[in-house]
From Swiss-Prot:
One of its GO terms (molecular function) is rRNA binding. GO terms for biological process: translation. Binds the lower part of the 30S subunit head. Binds mRNA in the 70S ribosome, positioning it for translation. Residues 39-107 form the KH type-2 domain. This is Small ribosomal subunit protein uS3. It comes from Dechloromonas aromatica (strain RCB). Part of the 30S ribosomal subunit. Forms a tight complex with proteins S10 and S14. The keyword Transcription does not apply.
Length: 261
C-alpha cells in the first residue's frame, strides 16, 4: 500500500527522520506535543511570505532549539536581526523555556515539495490556470535535478460545479521503494469557489541511510538477448537436427517396406 500511506511516515527510521526530536514521560508528553503544534502554527502564520520549507524542533535538557529552513532567510532575520529577536521572544512565551532560533537556507527551492505546493496554491489564489501552474512547477523541478515529480490538485478546479482531482507526473516516483528519497507535502488554496488541495511528491534519488545524500540512479545496462528477426535464424539455410548416440546403444533399426505390403 505504498500508494496510499504517507511517504514520510512510511520511511521514518529508515531514510527519514522526525521533525520533532525529544523525549518525555507520559505525564509531560501531551503538553509538549501541544506546544510543538502551536509553534508550527505560529511560524506558518508569521512567516507566510518567507518561503519556509520545514521546521525542526529539538529539546535538549531544559532548553529548546528551533531550526527554520527557508528559501528567503533574509526575510526571517529582518533588518539588523530585529524580526528574529521578536520571533525568539514569542517562541519562549509559547514553550515556556529558553529558545535558540537558527535559520537554514534552502539551496534549491524548486525541488522542495512544501515550497512547490505553496507556490501552486498562491498561483491558484491569483486565478492562474491550475494546469499551467502544475506543469510549470514540474518543469522547474526536473530542470533543477529532480528524478521525478507528481503533482495533484483536487477541488472545484476552474470553478467547476462538480469537484474533481487531476494529477500529472514526470519521471519516476517509486512510492513503495523504502530507499527512495521521496519529499512529500500538501497545501491549500483558498479560492472564491472553495478550498483546492494540492499534493506534491518529489523523487530526489536513492539513499541507504538517513544521513546520506540522495544519489541519482544510473540507467541499467540493457543485457537482454537481441530479438530474432522474422523467418529462419540463420537466413535461408535449412535447419539441421543433431542426434547424439549413447555409448553401447544399438543403431536404430531401419524400417524396410516390403513389396506388396
Amino acid at each position: 500500500m505504498g500508494q496510499k500511506i504517507h511517504p514520510t511516515g512510511f520511511r521514518l527510521a529508515v531514510t527519514k527522520n522526525w521533525s520533532s526530536r525529544w523525549y518525555a514521560n507520559s505525564k509531560d508528553f501531551p503538553g509538549m506535543l501541544n506546544e510543538d503544534i502551536k509553534v508550527r502554527e505560529y511560524l506558518k502564520r508569521k512567516l507566510a511570505h518567507a518561503s519556509v520549507g520545514r521546521v525542526l524542533i529539538e529539546r535538549p535538557a531544559k532548553n529548546a532549539r528551533v531550526t527554520v529552513y527557508s528559501a528567503r532567510p533574509g526575510v526571517v532575520i529582518g533588518k539588523k536581526g530585529e524580526d528574529i529577536e521578536q520571533l525568539r521572544t514569542d517562541l519562549q512565551r509559547i514553550m515556556g523555556v529558553p529558545v535558540h532560533v537558527s535559520i537554514e537556507e534552502i539551496r534549491k527551492p524548486e525541488i522542495d515539495a512544501q515550497l512547490i505546493a505553496d507556490s501552486i496554491a498562491q498561483q491558484l489564489e491569483k486565478r492562474i490556470m491550475f494546469r499551467r501552474a502544475m506543469k510549470r512547477a514540474m518543469q522547474n523541478a526536473m530542470r533543477l535535478g529532480a528524478q521525478g515529480i507528481k503533482v495533484m490538485s483536487a477541488g472545484r478546479l476552474n470553478g467547476a460545479e462538480i469537484a474533481r482531482s487531476e494529477w500529472y507526473r514526470e519521471g519516476r516516483v517509486p512510492l513503495h521503494t523504502l530507499r527512495a528519497d521521496i519529499d512529500y507535502a500538501t497545501s491549500e488554496a483558498l479560492t472564491t469557489y472553495g478550498i483546492i488541495g494540492i499534493k506534491v511528491w518529489v523523487y530526489k534519488g536513492d539513499m541507504l541511510d538517513r544521513n546520506e545524500q540522495p544519489v541519482a540512479e544510473e540507467p541499467a545496462a540493457d543485457d537482454r538477448r537481441p530479438r530474432r528477426t522474422p523467418g529462419r535464424p540463420d537466413g535461408d539455410k535449412p535447419r539441421t537436427r543433431t542426434v547424439k548416440k549413447v555409448d553401447g546403444a544399438a543403431d536404430p533399426a531401419k524400417r524396410v517396406r516390403k513389396a506388396g505390403a
